[in-house]
Amino acid sequence: MSSTPREYRRRMKCSLKRLIYAVNFLFFLFTFSLDLESLIKNELRKEFGEEVRLKNYKVLTGIPDNFSKVELKVYKNSPRGFLHLKNTKVGTIALELEWKCRVLVAKRDIYPGERLNFSNVEEREIYLERCPQNFKENFVNFVALKEIKKGTIVRRSYLKKEFLVKRGEIVNAVYENGNVVIRFRTKALENGYYGEVIRVLSPFSRKVIRGKIIGEGTVKILR
């Protein structure tokens, strides 16, 4: 049986009302989501500045109306955290985070046994869930244990520490006095890493002198 014009108009009005309600509800959710995301980012910025950024979040419990207290529970370098919104009830939001990390990145493929230097690695700031262990000393003291592909973050586990100068080796020496620069070859009497002072044998007087390691197989003679 066909509908009368009046019934048809009534059904259309009901459908339109449901559509308007659905659109308004979706708009409310979208607006609420934007406001909540802004709140989370603002709280993170107040606590950590630009050190951390929000990757994702999930509302675990209902958000109370007119909450009066905001409590951030985040530990530095942790990929997870929580934001609590408190009134008479507590709303909890789970956070997924990324931290600003200063890392070494391979500028080109690095092969096993190759020493790190400014030609094959560079420092960059990137965001990661956890920052890898920082180098507590100059990276030129390390050589690759395995092949490290271009663009890869160079982790401490990929490397081994190795002397830049080894006892008994013939090394390059530099002596500076004002504008006078003398370069010669001499024998290392000790092992050493970058920046360390070791004993070397003078080829001129055959006396023991001291030199500071400034590169692989290179020392600067101290006065």
From Swiss-Prot:
GO terms for cellular component: periplasmic space. GO terms for biological process: bacterial-type flagellum assembly; bacterial-type flagellum-dependent cell motility. Keywords: Bacterial flagellum biogenesis, Periplasm, Signal. Pfam families: ChapFlgA. Gene3D superfamilies: 2.30.30.760. It is found in: Periplasm. Its main location: periplasm. InterPro entries: Flag_basal_body_FlgA_C (IPR017585), Flagellar_FlgA (IPR039246), SAF (IPR013974). PANTHER family: FLAGELLA BASAL BODY P-RING FORMATION PROTEIN FLGA. NCBIfam families: flgA_cterm. Involved in the assembly process of the P-ring formation. It may associate with FlgF on the rod constituting a structure essential for the P-ring assembly or may act as a modulator protein for the P-ring assembly. Belongs to the FlgA family. This is Flagella basal body P-ring formation protein FlgA. The lineage of its organism: Bacteria, Pseudomonadati, Aquificota, Aquificia, Aquificales.
